[in-house]
Amino acid sequence: MPKTFAALTGALLLAATGARATEWPDYGGSPDQSKFVVTPDLTKKSVTRLEMAWMYSTDDERAYQFNPVIVDGVMYVLAKNSSLVAIDVRTRKELWIHANLRGITNRGINFWKSRDGKDRRLLFVMDDLLQAIDARTGKSIATFGKDGAVDLREDLGRDPATIRRVASSTPGRVFENLLILGSSPGEGYFSAPGDVRAYDVVTGKLAWTFHTIPRPGEFGYDTWPKDAWKYAGGVNVWGEITLDERRGIAYLPVSSPTYDYYGADRIGMNLFSDCLLALDARTGKRLWHFQMVHHDLWDYDPTAAPQLITVRKGGRKIDAVVQATKQGYVYVFDRETGKPVWPIEERPVRASDVPGEQAWPTQPIPSLEPTARQVVEPDDLTPFFITDAERAAWRERIGKARTGMFSPPAMVESAIIPGAVGGTNWGNTAANPGKGIVYLLNQDFPSFYKLQEQSDRNVAGARNRFGPADAATLERGKKAYEQSCGMCHGVDRAGTPAGPSLLSIGTQIGMPQLRRTVLYGNGRMPPIGHLSDGQIGDILAHLGGGGRPRRPADMPAAPTPAGPVVATGGIARPPVTATVEAPQEYPAGIEVPPQRYYTDYGLGFPYLLAPPWSQIIAYDLNRGVIRWRRPLGQDLDAAKEGGKNNGVPRGSQRQGMIVTSTGLVFSTARDGVLYAFDAENGDVLWSAKLPMATEGLPAVYELDGRHYIVVNATTPHTWGLNSRESGIGSAEPLGKGGYVIFALPGKR
């Protein structure tokens, strides 16, 4: 009787919420991105008995952000030097390996199957090519697109030969027979436009396009200069797309325009940048939009998955969509009309004094309590990690800086919180849809901006040295590297969890390739627009460049992993257009500002302000109140200095949650611990140390009535001032990560 009742209860919950309890067939678990699962066996009482059931080693030292897809008893993961691996979750054996997919969408893939189940596909982007793999065999589908792939550089209204980057790190969203896809064209001047496109999952044919930078005659065209559509870029969807399957509506958090921090060549509100955009998923027709930042100058693009919930307010039920942002704001709208559920007020903000710039005079501020700190004060400094002398210097520096979240970047320093990666970011939202509760991960992370002029950016001025560099050049390169590259790649060039080692990179690439990577970004690396060609050349010298770079034929081939390899490399990128430079000047005849300005991201000080640095938050949107908030993780360096309940610097970045029907919220954290919180009050009910830290979203599947939680633990731990540690509390060899799977004890 109890088992029957539990099964009936689970079935009713499943039907009521639309959650998927037994599989994880999409990035984020389901089209609605709620991460909500029905788990009759996992309760507040039983969770204390949760234990590691098994682990799949990635057999490499790569840090993955991959969210596994689990469907029909098969788990698909990225492992073994960026290979797609299919694993039978019952036998835990590899079914097939498609090896060496370097450049694949690193956060996840898309799964689709035909109604009769005979055609099952994995769809992903690799090096700007959309392609498909047979989910049963692991082999590329040659009939998809043109010779097995669709070149995403095409159909953007620009010369494909000049587009260096389009592929997004997030996989998109499947709806019926369509794959709705965003992009990541880069964040520098003259990046490609971020059109949203939908492709037929069987043929690869382009089904519809939505121009996020409107063209003449389209709605929003008048919010830009008349020729901006010819040169402006970004306004892309690199974050997480949410789908209301019943209504056929796709909700897209649209990114900021380029260049991020100076907009004299894009005067106006700049629709549809920084919008929550609702599109008809079948046709791409705009249903409604709301712009959360006008004329963005702060890289405040929304990226977190919009959450679909039912709110009880004013005596009625409202099907709502919720967008959490980097600023710590929470916006709530009626799903069908876009009407705000909780009030939003346009408030005056500071004007810009930078030549040519026209900051928008107001910004839309929601009435709901922010989840993040929004002002930097001299008294907010951390009690950890910095000396008294450093503290005094920081107090003076912050006291002189311009502050306030919407203070435009200027020729003097601005101290902004949340910064470019603060607040709530991708992976950081989940919900109990039926109860109107949204769960958020948040971090307080300031940015320090200071604009500078940049003029020597012509390709002809680049220094591609083929001889030894002098001492002055090496010293300039060392300084430029430490200021602009050291945080991610390490001052010693040995790498950090944020970026790979560069110890041998100087002998592998030349000035043109380094310049393209710096200006336009590559994979998870953002563009660094403030460096001149001279500085890039100096950095190359510091990295050991000077001799001729090795040709691709001289580079070592990627090793073939052990196991049932059925294919390798996917569909290779066509070798055409490899030497064509992206544009560095505006089209002829267009009136543009005489000067360009740049700044770095100012992200070198994640620990600077007093903790908590990272938090998990439960927001009750029926009442419009924060129900509870708790620190997320514990920084071990701070703990050594007596700190408790501090969170971790960068502690919520690239982390994710699972919400259960039984009142649990599981969350990963940068300290390499998986936590189970009580959904009602935030108490920690259980935790487990992982062999390595995590990046990316966890997943859930069910087998024989037991639910299994899958966590991608492949990233070295970092604490406080970027000290590193791995293998905490683990029997696994140090530095060996993998997918760790937890479950309640089974029959022995």
What kind of feature is each model-predicted range?
Residues 31-37, 61-65, 85, 260-261, ...:
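Short, solvent-exposed loop/turn elements at domain surfaces
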